[in-house]
């Protein structure tokens, strides 16, 4: 243990503790910009500079460890002035048109600039004349980047993709796509973790709010919107509402207020996904010799992009079931169009998703109907719909609750937990057990697949089918480890759930940003609690899904179901060629 003094307060901490963490342990806050604990501790921004007695130079607190007897001053006049100088230097190479930035009001640089009262003009502006690329779901804006390296470290250490890298040397050094190429030419999964960990507006999702506003204003369009499970756990964070109050039904009211004609729940097609994917698993499991193993879930588009580029030998192991988002669009433009007696081309389908990769998924050539129209017309992230609410002056705190529209508005507890890591596996096993035995298991029988561990495994016995070995992973880093272990023959599973983002969709790349705070666990808890308190907790008991099969699809894995609800993962290619 080491004892030191910080701002006159004695503190004892373990050896190798940084000055920053030692200060935080006694509630002394040192400002940071580039720092991410355990991921980016490189002192790049120098905002966390502190003064250590006996040392001639100021030192960054994030990457300097404590020593016995050290005396630290975190807010001396010398320190404050150094921080102001560093902020001015950052601002000289930063596009300060804050009113045009989606991160305005939620930007670490903007906050620090205000905190240090940096008003008026600063150093001479030195912006780069590089055109920005708006052709992908993830957008990088050169003159908003502060070169903090967070995106590089997240992509490398957490997601193991290495998409971002430092480019150039000296003062022109910047961040760009590695090996140089455009983002669209890379094997980026568009998971969006670089976006949610950017402290400023240097990285953001492609903004599609204008398309939705145009559709809402078009009297010839019938606007249909779906809300993903994980969105209900995060949509009202900007408005500081308690999750218990910020219900999905209040969001329905907000969407109706905006002018959407029909508001449905993606939970409906999450249940439908379980019926198709669960039936597919049973078919494969009971005819093992006909298939490759293990079977992988396919509802996460970031994961699908990952396996196609990194482990193409396993593309055939993916479930052919479309994601709930895409199933919804397909059902709306067929079954619902028939129910409403309207031309499917009049239907404009909007998805509200916790995910940036969903934008890429909706644009795939394999996600179109026989007429060539997309299943889903526009995908909005949670952040985008919040901006739309703000623009429409909608205050969720004063809204009443409105039920989802019928017939695509009912979802079970099993569907809700699609938004948390382990939820798809849990839901699938609940219904697979029933489809084999004709009896429901305890809805919490498969709790071993829940929780925030990045790689979980379990074995369950389904009477009449045998032992089922399963695994659940979240984050592409954990996924790479699992895939390497499978390829090496070190592990053997029957069914694997993969989510590209740590913690699953609850921590998705399209969710609200809380700088340096990971929200996936608490949002996941919200979803598991909804499941626990829902009367119907099995996807196969969704009466609207049952009616859809009876009236239209006939049966899981049937001809019409295969046409509408399944896809060919070999029908499109990643830039790497697979």
Regions found by a protein language model. Name each.
Residues 14, 136, 146, 189, ...:
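Residue-level recognition of alpha-helix initiation/capping sites
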Residues 159, 198, 336-340:
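Structural motif corresponding to the C-terminal cap of alpha-helices
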Residues 6-9, 53-54:
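Short strand-turn-strand beta-turns centered on an Asx-Gly dipeptide
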Residues 1-4:
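Short structural boundary motif marking the start of a folded domain
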Residues 9-15:
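A short N-terminal beta-strand-loop micro-motif at the entrance of redox/enzyme domains
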Residues 46-190, 196, 203-222:
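Fe-S ferredoxin-like electron-transfer domains
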Residues 15-75, 79, 205-578:
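Iron-sulfur-associated redox domains of electron-transfer enzymes in respiratory
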């Amino acid at each position: 243990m080491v004892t030191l003094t910080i701002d006159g307060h004695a503190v004892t901490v373990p050896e190798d503790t940084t000055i920053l963490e030692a200060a935080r342990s006694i509630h002394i806050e040192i400002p940071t910009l580039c720092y991410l604990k355990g991921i980016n501790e490189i002192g790049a921004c120098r905002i966390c500079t502190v003064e250590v007695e006996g040392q001639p130079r100021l030192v960054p607190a994030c990457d300097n460890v404590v020593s016995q007897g050290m005396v630290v001053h975190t807010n001396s006049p010398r320190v404050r002035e150094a921080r102001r100088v560093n902020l001015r230097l950052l601002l000289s190479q930063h596009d300060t048109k804050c009113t045009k930035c989606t991160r305005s009001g939620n930007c670490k640089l903007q906050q620090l600039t205000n905190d240090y009262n940096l008003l008026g003009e600063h150093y001479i502006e030195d912006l780069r004349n590089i055109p920005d690329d708006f052709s992908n779901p993830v957008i990088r804006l050169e003159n908003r980047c502060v070169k903090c390296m967070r995106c590089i470290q997240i992509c490398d250490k957490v997601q193991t993709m290495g998409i971002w890298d430092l480019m150039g040397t000296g003062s022109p050094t910047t961040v760009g796509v590695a090996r140089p190429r455009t983002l669209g030419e890379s094997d980026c999964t568009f998971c969006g973790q670089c976006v949610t960990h950017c402290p400023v507006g240097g990285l953001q999702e492609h903004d599609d709010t204008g398309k939705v506003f145009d559709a809402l204003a078009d009297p010839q369009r019938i606007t249909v919107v779906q809300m993903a499970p994980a969105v209900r756990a995060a949509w009202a964070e900007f408005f500081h509402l308690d999750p218990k109050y910020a219900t999905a039904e209040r969001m329905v009211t907000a969407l109706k207020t905006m002018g959407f004609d029909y508001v449905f729940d993606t939970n409906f097609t999450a249940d439908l996904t379980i019926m198709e994917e669960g039936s597919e698993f049973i078919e494969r499991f009971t005819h093992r010799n006909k298939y490759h193993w293990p079977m992988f879930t396919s509802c996460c588009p970031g994961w699908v992009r990952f396996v196609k580029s990194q482990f193409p030998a396993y593309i055939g192991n993916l479930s052919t079931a479309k994601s709930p988002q895409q199933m919804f669009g397909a059902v709306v433009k067929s079954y619902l169009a028939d129910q409403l007696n309207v031309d499917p081309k009049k239907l404009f389908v909007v998805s509200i998703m916790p995910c940036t990769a969903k934008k890429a998924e909706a644009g795939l050539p394999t996600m179109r109907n026989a007429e060539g129209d997309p299943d889903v017309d526009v995908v909005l992230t949670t952040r985008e719909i919040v901006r739309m609410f703000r623009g429409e002056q909608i205050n969720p705190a004063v809204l009443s609750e409105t039920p989802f529209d019928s017939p695509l508005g009912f979802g079970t507890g099993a569907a809700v937990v699609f938004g948390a890591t382990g939820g798809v596996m849990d839901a699938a096993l609940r219904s697979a057990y029933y489809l084999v035995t004709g009896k429901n298991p305890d809805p919490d029988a498969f709790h071993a697949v829940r929780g925030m561990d990045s790689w979980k495994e379990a074995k369950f016995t389904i009477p009449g089918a045998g032992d089922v070995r399963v695994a659940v992973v979240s984050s592409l880093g954990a996924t790479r480890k699992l895939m390497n272990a499978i390829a090496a023959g070190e592990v053997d599973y029957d069914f694997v759930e993969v989510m590209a983002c740590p913690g699953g969709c609850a921590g998705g790349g399209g969710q609200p940003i809380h700088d340096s705070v990971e929200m996936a666990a608490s949002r996941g808890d919200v979803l598991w609690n909804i499941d626990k308190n829902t009367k119907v907790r099995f996807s196969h008991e969704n009466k609207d899904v049952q009616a859809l099969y009876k009236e239209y699809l006939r049966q899981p894995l049937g001809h019409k179901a295969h046409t509408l609800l399944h896809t060919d993962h070999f029908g499109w290619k990643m830039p790497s060629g697979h």
